[in-house]
């Protein structure tokens, strides 16, 4: 009897233990899987609730960046940094761009971040401020430019610390060192600046020193003699103001090598003339024009067998060098029949050189004794609106447009271009080949 009672009690106890065990497991599963754990930012063991990160979208990087900001602002500030870290780690390039929008980003400790560059004429007073994403090290600025714009820029940290964009590998030399370079999606790098798979025959560069009676000083010049020049043939020539910059910063000889090798232009002798006193020599200076026409050109013609025909003799320059190039060609048209001006400062002397062009065009149209045939190429950046030294309206763009208005009334052959760029070596390097093609290839328009 007793034994039957004991054997009946154990199954009941086992059943109760099994029920309790199953109940505990169910409760534990509910707590572990169904309930959310709240993070305590003050606790060392807190677990951050990080949503799925937004990653850069190659098809629309700007849209994905905006999604990142929206997502980050929807969560607590202390949870945002991992989202930023993951996004930037996957970012293929910077600035972030799509069509006509560019987003600049900066990461680091700062009290302010600003953008300066061609887009605001490097003016700190008009430099836009970046926004900071609270709780992170991310600063960002969304801007709008033309789809084919090319602009130099830098970041200014805490109002006086000028920096290159550390996330942008593209830089370009400026007047005070390297700048970061923005290439909008529609900008096309000129073919002559792209890498080439084959070998290119290189011309040779020679140095000469001339004694100038017009300038009362010795002048050093550099002469590029092209490869593939026909023996005994008279070669066209081009004389380039700011010759040192064209050699060292623009890489003019490499561009000449490429265009000649690919037969986009004929072999050309290029004469690079560095200034000694740039502000004096390039300010409508008749002595400098006489040095070029009466001393330098005859020396080059005799030494390198260049063609004396004005229709095959060019002069060019940028900014003030472009002003002096146009002035020299207009006043000495019997020597120079080809002109190229890049961002020319034509307002100097109250538009004096523009007025000379107007007078020369009247003589050309009437067929008088001073009749001259000229072929001209001019280019200016649409962001060249506040460049120091342009005396009439503070705008190199404005001066070039006034020149273009005059040219439109003439019978001269000319090509005038405006590009969404600034007063930059990048513009002049990118259009050096275009100028050469227009001047020396009559079929190029």
Regions found by a protein language model. Give the residues of each.
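C-terminal motif of bacterial Sec signal peptides marking the signal peptidase cleavage site
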Residues: 25-28
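Bacterial signal peptide processing site
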Residues: 30-32
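Aromatic-rich carbohydrate-binding modules that target alpha-glucans
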Residues: 95-148, 158-187
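Short beta-strand element of the alpha/beta-hydrolase
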Residues: 222-225, 232-244
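Gly/Ser-rich "nucleophile elbow"/oxyanion-hole loop immediately N-terminal to the catalytic nucleophile
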Residues: 229-233, 280-319
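Active-site machinery of serine-nucleophile hydrolases
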Residues: 244-295
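Primarily recognizes the serine-hydrolase "nucleophile elbow" in alpha/beta-hydrolase
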Residues: 251, 302, 309-371
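C-terminal catalytic histidine-bearing segment of alpha/beta-hydrolase fold enzymes
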Residues: 379, 385, 395-445
């Amino acid at each position: 009897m007793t034994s039957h009672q004991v054997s009946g009690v154990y199954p009941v106890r086992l059943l109760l233990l099994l029920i309790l065990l199953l109940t505990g497991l169910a409760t534990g599963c509910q707590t572990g899987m169904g309930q959310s754990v709240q993070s305590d930012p003050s606790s060392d063991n807190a677990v951050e609730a990080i949503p799925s990160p937004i990653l850069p979208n190659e098809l629309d990087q700007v849209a994905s960046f905006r999604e990142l900001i929206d997502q980050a602002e929807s969560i607590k500030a202390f949870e945002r940094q991992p989202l930023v870290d993951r996004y930037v780690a996957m970012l293929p390039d910077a600035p972030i761009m799509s069509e006509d929008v560019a987003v600049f980003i900066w990461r680091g400790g700062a009290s302010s971040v600003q953008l300066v560059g061609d887009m605001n004429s490097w003016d700190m007073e008009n430099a836009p401020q970046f926004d900071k994403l609270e709780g992170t090290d991310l600063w960002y600025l969304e801007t709008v430019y033309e789809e084919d714009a090319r602009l130099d820029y830098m970041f200014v940290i805490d109002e006086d610390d000028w920096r290159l964009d550390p996330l942008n590998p593209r830089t370009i030399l400026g007047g005070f060192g390297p700048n970061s370079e923005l290439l909008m999606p529609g900008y096309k790098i000129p073919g002559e600046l792209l890498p080439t798979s084959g070998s290119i025959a290189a011309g040779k560069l020679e140095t000469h020193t001339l004694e100038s009676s017009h300038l009362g000083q010795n002048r050093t010049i550099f002469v590029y003699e092209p490869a593939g020049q026909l023996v005994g043939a008279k070669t066209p020539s081009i004389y380039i103001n700011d010759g040192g910059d064209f050699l060292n910063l623009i890489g003019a000889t490499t561009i000449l090598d490429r265009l000649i090798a690919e037969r986009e232009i004929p072999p050309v002798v290029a004469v690079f003339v560095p200034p000694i006193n740039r502000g004096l020599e390039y300010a409508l200076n008749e002595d400098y024009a006489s040095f070029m026409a009466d001393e330098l050109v005859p020396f080059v013609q005799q030494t390198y067998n260049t063609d004396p025909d004005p229709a095959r003799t060019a002069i060019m320059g940028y900014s003030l060098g472009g002003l002096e190039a146009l002035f020299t060609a207009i006043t000495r048209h019997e020597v120079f029949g080809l002109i190229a001006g890049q961002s020319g400062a034509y307002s100097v002397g109250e538009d004096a050189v523009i007025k000379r062009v107007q007078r020369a065009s009247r003589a050309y149209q009437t067929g008088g004794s001073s009749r001259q045939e000229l072929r001209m190429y001019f280019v200016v950046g649409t962001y060249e609106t506040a460049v120091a030294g342009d005396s009439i309206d503070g705008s190199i763009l404005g001066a070039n447009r006034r020149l273009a208005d005059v040219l439109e009334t003439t019978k001269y052959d000319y090509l005038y271009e405006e590009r969404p760029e600034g007063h930059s070596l990048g513009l002049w390097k990118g259009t050096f080949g275009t100028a050469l093609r227009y001047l020396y290839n009559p079929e190029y328009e």
